[in-house]
Regions:
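Electropositive, gly/pro-rich neighborhoods at or near active sites that engage anionic ligands
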Residues: 1-145
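Residue-level detector of flexible, active-site-proximal loop/helix-junction positions
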Residues: 81, 156-158, 216
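C-terminal functional extensions of proteins
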Residues: 188, 192-242
Length: 242
């Protein structure tokens, strides 16, 4: 159960990764909110949503925000960083408050905690680890810190890839979700992560599905891709409030 307390919720997620056999954490922030609003938006990682063009992607992203299963959690924008999108996302979500936390749960002032505890928690869980992220990820670097059982690569612009290959990808997700039980799936695929988590949850909720965003970029892509990766930044010291 989430309490909308920045540090406390972080450790609750870690506890569930170890102790639960069924949990999803899907995170919606400004990028996802702008897609839902049908605004053209993209980012440095190479994904781009075009207004009125990628409406299939938008529809699937919206549906992925409506789950009310008791073990399905959503992280959304906080009031201290983005109150307009906090309010907007709350107006769409149907699940209860106990299933809501911060989209920033792994970043900002919690990032040092993530660095210290997250990979250790994965190792301590002794569960199979499956990573879904960009195809150029350096899986060997991550493997040196935690054993990765499987890798689902995402090529190019995730928005276009999903729309052009939707049925094939659904088949692939069905295969992967049904191959594992009580495994931990880590997603770092932009706003597509939320769709993938929802699709796999519907196939097999007896796994752990977590959107980790850019947190492992220093390992996976050998770069500090976000400001919070640098400990001297303003964001690295921000303790988010609900």
């Amino acid at each position: 159960m989430m309490k909308q307390e920045f540090k406390e919720d972080f450790f609750e997620v870690l506890r569930m990764i170890v102790e639960s056999d069924s949990m999803a954490l899907s995170r919606y922030a400004d990028g996802e909110a702008n897609v839902l609003k049908n605004n053209t938006i993209g980012n440095k990682d190479g994904w781009l949503y075009k207004q009125d063009k990628n409406l299939v992607f938008r529809a699937d992203l919206r549906k992925a925000l409506l789950c009310t299963d008791p073990n399905y959690f959503y992280g959304i924008s906080c009031t201290c960083c983005d109150k307009p999108n906090h309010d907007y996302l709350l107006s769409i979500i149907r699940t209860g408050r106990e299933n809501l936390t911060f989209s920033n749960i792994f970043v900002n002032a919690n990032f040092p905690l993530f660095q210290e505890h997250f990979l250790k928690t994965l190792a301590a869980s002794k569960k199979d680890i499956v990573v879904c992220t960009g195809k150029k990820a350096k899986m060997r670097d991550l493997n040196e810190r935690v054993p990765v059982k499987d890798f689902i690569p995402i090529p190019g612009n995730c928005v276009v890839w999903w729309e052009k290959n939707r049925e094939y990808i659904r088949g692939l997700l069905d295969l992967k979700a049904s191959q594992y039980t009580n495994a931990v799936f880590l997603f770092a695929a932009g706003p597509l992560s939320e769709i993938l988590i929802h699709e796999m949850w519907q196939v097999n909720p007896k796994n752990i599905y977590v959107d980790i965003g850019s947190t492992l970029d220093p390992f996976l892509f050998r770069r500090n891709s976000r400001v919070y990766h640098r400990g001297d930044s303003e964001f690295a010291k921000r303790y988010c409030s609900w």
